[in-house]
């Protein structure tokens, strides 16, 4: 009421004036309000930028907010650097992330991040069907179908830190393979 329509602008730009002239508001409180307002303004700006990337593709309206919740102020950079990080969100698969990457961010067809995301997608799909291990050629072929490019080298490149390859050329996510072995050992001990 003190400043009328200028209240928000004055709070945003001059918290000292607010603290001096409005009884009951300390300088610390006025600065806190100013910081929150600036933070909200930054989030609004970020939301608009992310909406420009993911909006209009028929995706859920909450996606920009989910992205900001996950990556905070680094959301835009994370999205531009590797749009396939979207696959880490619930109900965002490779095809959705790939559509955003290809249509909006013009990611190259042969992008390493794109190939890795396709490989992870195929492996996750395989796990969701109850299979920890996938035959190497099947992984290569299914990844190639998704990306329309050769993913063999990407599989080799990520295999040391992410994948486990057995002697029969079957491949598994290291964590899933370790979990499977742990469960098998537990069951074996229970049955003996």
PLM-predicted stretches and their roles:
Residues 65, 129-143:
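Short acidic, hydrophobic short linear motifs in intrinsically disordered regions
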Residues 38, 43-53, 115, 119, ...:
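Long, charged amphipathic helices and adjacent flexible linkers at domain junctions
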Residues 5-8, 24-25, 73-77, 144-151:
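Short, basic interhelical loop/turn and adjoining N-cap
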């Amino acid at each position: 009421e003190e400043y009328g329509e200028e209240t928000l602008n004055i709070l945003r730009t001059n918290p000292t004036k607010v603290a001096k002239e409005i009884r009951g508001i300390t300088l610390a409180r006025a600065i806190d309000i100013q910081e929150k307002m600036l933070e909200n303004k930054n989030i609004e700006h970020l939301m608009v930028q992310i909406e420009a990337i993911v909006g209009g593709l028929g995706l859920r309206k909450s996606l920009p907010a989910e992205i900001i919740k996950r990556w905070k102020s680094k959301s835009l950079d994370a999205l531009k650097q590797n749009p396939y990080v979207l696959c880490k969100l619930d109900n965002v698969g490779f095809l959705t992330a790939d559509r955003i990457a290809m249509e909006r961010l013009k990611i190259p067809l042969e992008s390493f991040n794109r190939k890795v995301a396709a490989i992870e997608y195929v492996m996750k799909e395989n796990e969701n069907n109850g299979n920890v291990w996938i035959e190497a050629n099947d992984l290569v072929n299914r990844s190639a179908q998704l990306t329309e490019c050769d993913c063999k080298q990407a599989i080799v490149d990520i295999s040391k830190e992410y994948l486990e390859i057995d002697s029969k050329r079957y491949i598994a996510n290291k964590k899933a393979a370790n979990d499977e072995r742990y469960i098998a050992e537990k069951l074996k001990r229970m049955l003996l």
